Amino acid sequence: MPPTETLRPGERGTAGGPGAGAPEQTYIVRQSNKYYEHRDSQATAMSVDYSGQWVLLAGRGHLALQRLGQDDGSLRRHERQSKYEVSVAEFAICPSRKEYCAIATSQHIDIVRWGTAEPHYEMSLRGHTRTVTDIDWHGKDPNLLVSCSIDTFSHIWDLREPRKPALSLNAVCMSGATQVGFNRVSGNLLAAAHDGDLRIWDIRKGSCPTHYITAHLNRVHGINWSHKRETCLATASQDGTVKYFDVCNPRRAEKIITTMSPVWRARYTPIGNGLVSIVVPHLGRGENSLLLWSNSKQTDPICSFVGHTDVILDFAWRPNRESSNEIELVTWSRDRTLRVWKIDDNMLKLCEPSAEEIESRFEPDLSELRVPTPPEFLHPRSILVAASLPISTGDGACNTLPMARSPSFGGGYYRREEPHIARSLTDQPTCSLHHEFSLLNTNMPHVEVDTLDAIKRYACFKICAGGHTVILQVTFTTSYPSPSAPPDFQLCQGTTLSSEVSGVLLKVLRCNALQRVKKSRTCLEQCLRALVAAMKKKVAAVGGADRSQLLLQSPRLEGALSSTLHDACIPYPRTSGVHFNAIGMLTTFAQPVNNKRLTLRQHTALTPRTFSSINGSGLLGNVMATAQREANASFYLQERMISGKPGKQRAIRQMNGSPVVHVYDTSSLLHISRRMAREFSLDKCNIAETCRKNGEICRQHGRLDLVPVWLLAELIATPQIPHETLNDLLFYKDPFKKSLLESLIMHYAISGDIQTAVLLACLFDKCPTGGGAIMEKTVRLPPQLNSQISPYHTVLPLDVKSSSSSNTWQQLKQLRSNSWSDSLDLEIKQIQSDAYACSLIRRTKMPLFDQFKRAYAEILFGWQLLSKRALILKHTQNTPPPVQGVEFVTECRKCAKPKRTPKCEPCKRPVLFCVLCRLPVKGAANACLACGHGGHIDHMMQWFEKHNVCATCGCKCLERTSELLALLS
């Protein structure tokens, strides 16, 4: 792995040139060269154009241009009306579009072309659904622009086709994108920040990111690609660090700058070997630091730019097209001041590494080049290193390579980059021992970490593999990981290996450590992995482990436990569960007690998708068993008849290692009882007697708490006033009885005793139908039906006296003619309203009580009490009213039957087709009531916006439909 160097900014050092013997860097405090104050400007974004003459200040109320060459400080202000602040503004960086700039406001991006007089709005890019957080222009193609948003998308726009993004990069994550940037060397790579993570995309293949980098612990505020190296970038974060990354080695940062406050921006200098960062103090209390760092050494900043009194919002580099030896830094702050800082040649020299540092750093590589081994001599990296090394002369002087012009910054001044940047950063000195310990993988298989002491510079580990244990102590020298200082390894007391095997393992450790430290790389984790592999191989060769213990490392087990870390998005199979059903049966299953759950640290296979595959592969099976069962686990108990001896009954034999499904009867813990449900009565001939009988049933089954309830129900059903015997309708109009009954039903329904609640609701639901006096007095037919002659010739006479009250309704319906009778219909409605009147349950409560009855009917179905269930369902008469309205009746083309649904269920074919697009209609539809033609509602609206006749038959659908609807209303 590449080394990591974590450095903190120190105190101000002493001045010294590059050739001074002191290692401290010069800490310069620099004031701004130019200063512009705009107190009335509310700009929140800033950008410098391609020529370096104009600075754009963009805000919610205006766009302003400041010419840097003028000393009067006047602004070219252009008003704009927007209720949102400008989140970011960027000028194009290609000369062919140098007058274009992109301004992001809320969810859209405006492309503005600056003319001689006023800005011209060329286009608006709309594709994001949340606020746009960052934009960046392509460095090679002037037509490409990338934007990112909180909606997690990064859109690449082509200005030649601005209606939609040319490419959308979707990061499947919960956090939005905060920063985005194109690669400055090739332009093919793109980096997007999502909180503390980075996604590296290749725009030639936008289906998925090419690299995932866990960069910071907090949000990333800035991304900047290197101007010289294609794969290197720097990030600034809320956690107070600036990190250098190489996307070829995304696992760890190359170098780290640590500050005491959040870092808002960090960008490479266009020339030289520096980086500028903005440090924002916590809660605005502290110094608003604008610091220049060297990429080769991060102990101290090179320069501090002072002058701003508030938070620096943004900064940009001002290219000098006439003189490329100098660059200028332009900053805009919340104190409403625009400052210009000059980066002179002395600052750029301080960013370069000293000659002593270069020579001391690469002396080991020179020694390797004198006696090269064939593989390393032919390695391309070795050739690159040899080409970038300083040239040694006989007198000890060191001649460096001549300076060159930078092709990436207008052919300007280009300082010789330090050799360790010209080659891969993986070969530079590594981080401290403390940082190496913090990056150590503590979940390595077979390895337990006992002690990690960075102060005393030693570590202790316990390795268990192949049935043996090794206690390893590693001691690090102060110069580790220099090529001449590998760590020292020692096997301590507690090691169970023989002296011969221990010597072989120590030799393996020293060889691996020497190979790593020769390249100034860390070696601890690689040595531990090599030790585990050598222990397995050596112990298996000498036969020093018991076979039963080696079963733990069998290929079958390793195959089952492998590569599960790659299946992080796949849910692990359920190994236990519990579920209730409606009648109180509890079903449970779990893994067997004798099964051993193993750790998931060593994974080389996929995560099992089902519980049976777990047991089949041996992941949860008894791996210490001598015999392995090849069959998959089954959730079912196998019932087999034991033959051979008479009188033997059926036995259940459980398979070895298979889970058992347990079914428990928990009905005794609930408020319902199957035995009581079988005996309960719903006889309505005498409701009081029925209540007395149900109360006695509760007493017999030990439910003494329900006896007072049925006693109250008996009192409700008993008439209390003599007048009620003359007219039983008075019995059902007692408000006290209605309130008491509804309170009892709701109390037991809420408490979970749905059985008692439903029985009470059914008993007092409606009038008795089996010869009760109330029904006989309620159903009184009109006088014309009592006579033997019907007023209509098509209605047969009805003998009401000979008919019972139970089938009166059916006779009335059967004897109706097709002609309409006012008197008969009115009387039937009156009879139905009287039937509702003879009930102690209000009509508004009936839908709720019907739901209780249907739920209790499902419980009776589970108990197989079908007759009781049918009796309960007879009392659910409050069905929802049919939906009334205009329906589209279409005819199926196959069966030629009229259908009121969009699909013919028997034929499995759609029946409603749009007359415009000829496609089946599955969503909102509309049709003419006169001609019947219609289709998708969107297509119909688009058609009738320009036409007033039907597209099929020429019918004036709008007028005819309005007339028919007026008649219906």
UniProtKB/Swiss-Prot annotation:
Annotated Pfam families: WD40 (PF00400), zf-RING_16 (PF17120)
Binding positions for Zn(2+) 3 per the UniProt entry: 928, 955, 957
Main location: membrane
WD repeats: 127-167, 172-211, 215-255, 258-303, 307-351
Cited SMART domains: WD40
Organism field: Drosophila melanogaster (Fruit fly)
Leader peptide range in chain numbering: none
Family: Belongs to the WD repeat WDR59 family.
Full protein name: GATOR2 complex protein Wdr59
Modified residues (Phosphothreonine): 373
GO molecular function: signaling adaptor activity; zinc ion binding
SUPFAM superfamilies named in the record: WD40 repeat-like
Stretches the record annotates as Disordered: 1-24
Stretches assigned to the RWD domain: 435-538
Biological role: A component of the GATOR complex, which functions as a regulator of the amino acid-sensing branch of the mTORC1 signaling pathway. The two GATOR subcomplexes, GATOR1 and GATOR2, regulate the mTORC1 pathway in order to mediate metabolic homeostasis, female gametogenesis and the response to amino acid limitation and complete starvation. GATOR2 activates the mTORC1 signaling pathway through the inhibition of the GATOR1 subcomplex, controlling the switch to cell proliferation and growth under nutrient replete conditions and during female oocyte development.
Gene that this polypeptide is encoded by: Wdr59
Residue numbers binding Zn(2+) 4: 933, 950, 953
Keyword terms of this UniProt record: Lysosome, Membrane, Metal-binding, Phosphoprotein, Repeat, WD repeat, Zinc, Zinc-finger
Binding site for Zn(2+) 2: 917, 936, 939
Knocked-out gene: effects: Flies are viable and fertile but ovaries are significantly larger than ovaries, due to increased activity of the mTORC1 signaling pathway.
